[in-house]
């Protein structure tokens, strides 16, 4: 699979997964036995972290779809395409890390690594497009 296509495929599956996760959050708000407590904790703790993961998961899915599309359609060097692609995919560790933090008590290292990777990917892609010979 080519660089770019990997990002589009991963982004679409990631988007689907975090959309399903959004439906789980809706069911917790509307139908779960402890829904009053869930609603009361809207801006704190697990509820806040779960919403943070949902929004970043969908954002990073979209960013990977965009990364893939731009890599495939703009004259970005192969070296830049490879690194931008892998950094974008690595960025998806951030929302996964947020879920792992509150659900499994995992270290925030995945959140930090993913955040750094997605910022690096966007910055590198910006410079690569800037340097590209566009007509």
Residue spans for each PLM region:
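Polytopic transmembrane helical bundles with strong interfacial aromatic enrichment
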Residues: 2-54, 58-135
